[in-house]
Amino acid sequence: TPQHPENAISLFIEAFQSVDPDGKRLAKVFRDSFDQIYDGQHTGRYSIEQLSKTESAHLGSIVEINIRREFDDIINDGEVMDFEIKDYEVDCKYSKSRFGWMIPSEALGHHGMLCHADDATSRFRVGFIKFDNSVLNKGGNRDGKQTVSAAGRKYITWLHFDEPFPPNTFLQLDPDDKDRILSLKSGAARLNELFRTAQEMRIPRGIVATVAQQKDYMKRIRYNGGSRSALQPEGIVILGDYNAHREIADALQLPIPGEGESLSVRLFPLQPDEDEKFVTIDGVNWRKARESDPIVTAPQIPFK
């Protein structure tokens, strides 16, 4: 039997913290939802600005569906609202602006799971609130939806507030770099240029798909004719989500590639008088290259 409503929100928070203590699963939901709506593999898109109004509006449904699917262990379908969590009806609302949630009148008296994510800053927020007139603005829009009032915002209990999610590397690149990468005619050339340009940055698979615009796009990275082979003579290695690659990234104090992510870096042999982070591959000590270092063919990196 449901407890007192004030306890409901602490139950929701506990439920999520018990299955996703660091928020990594929620973070992945937002990355996947953006990638899904961009559909970069088929469209080459990588930004909310490139979507039509209808597509933008659809992002909320995609987020809701993906949260429901990812958290099947704690969320059921609601009878009147989107979700049922701990025997309570919960409406899931996404807004691309920080406090823009549109609350339908039928949600009054129920709880809300309020979501916001910004792909430009790679930060997301998820919080819970009980919807009643005291937290909503008076008067709604044409279809009777209301927004959370400025005074009502303090009643949101945040599960995550401006937590990072896997970055959209492409949005973080210089516009000239973006244009140069996308102007190349073949998927292979675009991928090679991406890894040349966006070094030491985690590159999610969605960006690889967007740039390659080909089926089995992850295969385009590998040795045997992929980007790893193409960039080896330039001294650049591409690390993936293999443990051996994560260890290399860690040893060189680089960002660690997450699931499905890649990261490129140019290497140079450690000189006898140098004292800096290095990694040993096939008996040679390698460090991150500096701009002033000449190009030396990169080692072939192990996968185990």
Predicted regions and their residues:
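Nucleic-acid endonuclease domains
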Residues: 1-81, 94-304
